[in-house]
Amino acid sequence: MANGDPVRSVGAALLRRHDLLRVDPSAWNAMLSRQPALADLPLVAGWAGRGYPVIVRRRLCGDDADAVPAAVPLPPSHGKRRIAIALPSGVVAVLPPLLLRDAARAAPRAWQGAVAALLELGQAVETTPRVFGALLWEQATGLPYLTGASDLDLIWPVPDRRILDRLLGALPRLEADGPVRLDGEVLLPDGRAVQWREIAEARGPSAHVLVKSVDGVAMCPVAHLFARAAPAA
């Protein structure tokens, strides 16, 4: 998977939603030897050996505290299953989600105008969109994840309220004018994320939205979204 972003070790920074993990193939095979049922699932046995990433998932109560919670999403042709796994921290390297500009070539032809407009929007409001969902996995693996019903799932890092307001002022119009539903989240400086549509529809000074992190979900007043400091790198 081509990605110009720097690789981080797990200990170098907190894991964030939608981070990708590159797994050492020998460690992958060792994991499968301990969980042989996984090796029988389509595509899973050779996943790491082909260079495919896995994705960070929310930690569950049964996960080992020292393990990295991850998931393997299979394409629709293989049941669209999301397989939960846990990996030792020493066998993975962390990559941020793929930039939209790097995933654009995997997008359907009908989406290309919308993708170009979204990239222009990112430049105009001073943020850089990244992808998750079907477009990410189509680009990362070359497997057929996109269907006629797929959304375009985007992550928009928003360092401050000014950029958030400018972004939310433009996204609904771009979606209305384009061929694809724009789903996704704004990424707050502290690593938490909120669906952009939910913030756009929030009304009044006391409005709350659902905020997600790798540790769980919680309701948060819109007015307090930027109250927490960004984590140290």
Task: Indicate where each model-derived feature is located.
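Helical scaffold of the NTase/Pol beta-like nucleotidyltransferase catalytic core
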Residues: 2-134, 173-180
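Broad gene-expression machinery/nucleic-acid interaction feature
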Residues: 67-69, 149, 153, 181-183
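Solvent-exposed residues in well-ordered beta-strands and their adjoining turns
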Residues: 73-75, 157-159, 187
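Residue-level signal for secondary-structure boundary sites
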Residues: 78-80, 162, 192
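Mature, function-bearing regions of proteins
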Residues: 82-84, 88-92, 199, 205-223, ...
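Active-site nucleotide-donor binding segment shared across nucleotidyl transfer reactions
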Residues: 119-152, 156-162
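Short, conserved charged micro-motifs
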Residues: 161-169
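Conserved catalytic core of two-metal-ion nucleotidyltransferases
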Residues: 174-211
